[in-house]
Curated annotation (Swiss-Prot):
EC number(s) reported in the record: 2.7.1.-
HAMAP family attached to this UniProt entry: KptA
Name of the protein this chain belongs to: Probable RNA 2'-phosphotransferase
UniProt-listed Pfam families: PTS_2-RNA
Keywords, comma-separated and alphabetical: NAD, Transferase
UniProt key word Secreted: no
Length: 188
């Protein structure tokens, strides 16, 4: 399978497992799990031709580790990023490292400077331990801006942090007082 085919399947999985399972009649449980065979059968019926081997390849090669297979390989879910109300994944609550990072685009900075980071249509704000990963996320939306998050201070103030299956840190919101701009976009 080539990269284009893997990317197409990955985008479909993200759409179904994070945002719109009902678009193909897929059912997710409260923790976001879907039966692998059911997902493949319904995707095939909607014109997406792939099998379990292709799905496994997408899961294994996805750089951001967006998907998780159950221990018995019978179920699949998105690691994080759900916007569907029926999914309320119970991620492990953990103490975060002192500093986490968030990548955004410069066009969102006015809003962030006013209200901090909010989850929007998702259940959580996504943070990472790696500044380069954060910058690559910011690049997807325009001129990237790197923000440092005072995770230690937030945690000590009682804010709950969770860690998804793929290592991404999740929090309900980040106040503007807990943010520091580390890298602004380079003017062209």
């Amino acid at each position: 399978m080539n990269k284009k085919q893997r990317d197409e399947i990955s985008k479909l999985l993200s759409y179904l497992l994070r945002h719109a399972p009902e678009s193909m009649g897929l059912t997710l449980d409260r923790d976001g799990w879907s039966e692998v065979d059911d997902l493949i059968r319904k995707a095939n019926a909607h014109g997406y031709a792939f099998d379990r081997q292709a799905l496994n390849e997408v899961v294994e090669t996805n750089e951001k580790k967006r998907f998780t297979l159950s221990e018995d390989d019978q179920r699949i879910r998105a690691a994080q990023g759900h916007s569907t109300v029926q999914v309320q994944v119970q991620h492990a609550e953990k103490e975060p490292p002192a500093t986490l990072y968030h990548g955004t685009a410069s066009r969102f900075m006015t809003s962030i400077e006013t209200q901090g980071l909010i989850a929007g249509s998702r259940h959580h704000v996504h943070l990472t331990e790696d500044p380069e990963t954060a910058m690559s996320v910011g690049k997807r939306y325009g001129q990237p801006v790197l923000l440092a998050v005072d995770a230690k201070g937030m945690f000590e103030a009682g804010v709950r942090f969770f860690q998804a299956d793929n290592g991404i840190w999740l929090v309900k919101a980040v106040s503007r007082d807990s943010l520091t701009v580390l890298r602004l976009p380079i003017p062209e």
